[in-house]
């Protein structure tokens, strides 16, 4: 039995969970999310909890058991609290600016990068060097933050580029050169 999969998911007040095979819908104060559930997984929806069970002990079912439980829990947390990733921009002349549903980045290239934000994602820029990526879908927030970071990842010599706020960059010593 999966240690993660066997734990029930608590449903807070104000959250509504409905399941019409194979689509699970979670609605809350911040919005609603849909996810397709594998046919090998069975859901038991009660008043204040959701239990995830597997139909058989096949390898595919066992591997999806804990994953499905975690994905559903992330949906519940997303519609109640939401998710956030913080990116920091380091470097001379590197800056970000939010213009509606487009994030404009100046990262030392000959042209600015205009990144269109996916639906359901909001971006807030603080002092042109901190970017807050927020949304209710954890997967989409992480994916969007990773795409923004990929435009100019941090380099190990001076630490210039875009990095996550909690990320630690291992610095390298430069060449010593001939003397």
Swiss-Prot record:
Fill in the subunit field for this protein: Part of the 50S ribosomal subunit.
Keyword rRNA-binding in record: yes
Q: Which Gene3D superfamilies match?
A: Ribosomal protein L6, alpha-beta domain
Keyword line: Ribonucleoprotein, Ribosomal protein, RNA-binding, rRNA-binding
Which PANTHER family does this one have?
60S/50S RIBOSOMAL PROTEIN L6/L9, LARGE RIBOSOMAL SUBUNIT PROTEIN UL6M
Respond yes or no to whether keyword Metal-binding is given for this record. no
Biological process terms from the Gene Ontology for this record are:
cytoplasmic translation
Species annotation: Geobacter metallireducens (strain ATCC 53774 / DSM 7210 / GS-15)
The protein, known as: Large ribosomal subunit protein uL6
- Record's Gene Ontology CC terms? cytosolic large ribosomal subunit
């Amino acid at each position: 039995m999966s240690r993660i999969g066997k734990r029930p998911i608590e449903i807070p007040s104000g959250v509504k969970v409905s399941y019409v095979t194979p689509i699970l819908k979670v609605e809350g104060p911040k919005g609603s999310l849909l996810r397709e559930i594998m046919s090998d997984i069975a859901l038991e929806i009660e008043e204040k909890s959701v239990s995830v069970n597997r139909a058989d002990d096949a390898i595919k079912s066992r591997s999806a058991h804990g994953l499905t439980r975690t994905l559903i829990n992330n949906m519940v947390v997303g519609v109640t609290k939401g998710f956030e990733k913080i990116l920091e921009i380091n470097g001379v002349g590197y800056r970000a600016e939010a213009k509606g549903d487009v994030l404009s980045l100046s990262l030392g290239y000959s042209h600015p990068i205009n990144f269109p934000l996916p639906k359901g994602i909001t971006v807030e820029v603080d002092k042109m060097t901190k970017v807050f990526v927020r949304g209710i879908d954890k997967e989409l927030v992480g994916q969007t933050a990773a795409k923004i970071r990929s435009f100019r990842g941090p380099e190990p010599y001076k630490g210039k580029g875009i990095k996550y706020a909690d990320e630690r960059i291992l610095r390298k010593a430069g060449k010593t050169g001939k003397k």
